[in-house]
Amino acid sequence: MGELVLAAKITHVPSLMLSEQLEPLKGTRDGPINALKLIGQRARERGADTFVVFDTHWISNFGFHINANPWHSGSYTSPEAPHMINDIVYDFPGNSELADLIAAETAKDGPLALAHKVKTMPVEYGTIVPMHYMNKDKAMSVVPIASPVFASVDENRRFGAAVTRAIKRSRYKAAILASGSLSHQLFENSKLGPEAWNKISSEFNRQMDLRVLDLWREGRFAEFCAMLPDYTRKCNGEALMADTVMLFGALGWDKYGGKAEQLCEYFPSSGSGQVAVEFHLN
């Protein structure tokens, strides 16, 4: 029997990698970078062999899509931000067996779910950036999962629950990573400038993000799940916060009773709100 050994909400913003090289960002993202490294270390210490990544930069329309390739490799340039993320080489194993199980388990509940083995299918930067810090040694297999922007909150919740069931049916120990922002209202072009790297675009969004972190810290997960449908819409959720909805579906939704541990300070990035939080399973 398999096991879910770790679950976390993580950041993947381009400024993480840029902060290792360029002023004025140099060194400013050490907190979240160290948080990603810590999550990777904890996954290994708990015997994880696979990262399942809910990737808000792999956008899909209809159904649920899982990258089931046995190996992921390529050179990635972001079509939305080629000036920030370009020619990033990635190379790590996949897990076709677990991907197939996730698709099969999801289909039992009704929705279309497809596990793709297509050599030309790329991996998006919502997976590539965290793997840069968590999986440089290629020791862990990776299953990227798309964010379906036309799925309802309830459909994404049920999908997350199916992922956990599939993991438990498998022979693998997996860590789930919800890779995406909290609020996600980026700046208009006219408001861009050096200071935008470290500013939020909306005080309302910032206050809502901080309220969410308070609810998590206080263990008030039923209240959070009740507000999540509104939060996704009113705070400009990245891919409608599909990753967060799937994560809480995987955790048991409003029945989750574990502890949320914030691993870095909340930080703004180009208008969005970012954080790294582990949701403990014991």
Question: Residues of each region from the PLM?
Answer:
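Non-transmembrane, aqueous-exposed alpha-helical and coiled segments at domain scale
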Residues: 161-169, 174
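A structural signal for small-residue-enriched, beta-sheet-centric alpha/beta enzyme cores
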Residues: 182-190
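Beta-strand elements within well-structured catalytic alpha/beta cores of enzymes
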Residues: 49-55, 145, 172-182, 247
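Flexible, D/E/H-enriched segments
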Residues: 1-49, 60-158, 169, 189-282
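Glycine-centered flexibility sites
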Residues: 160, 178-183, 273
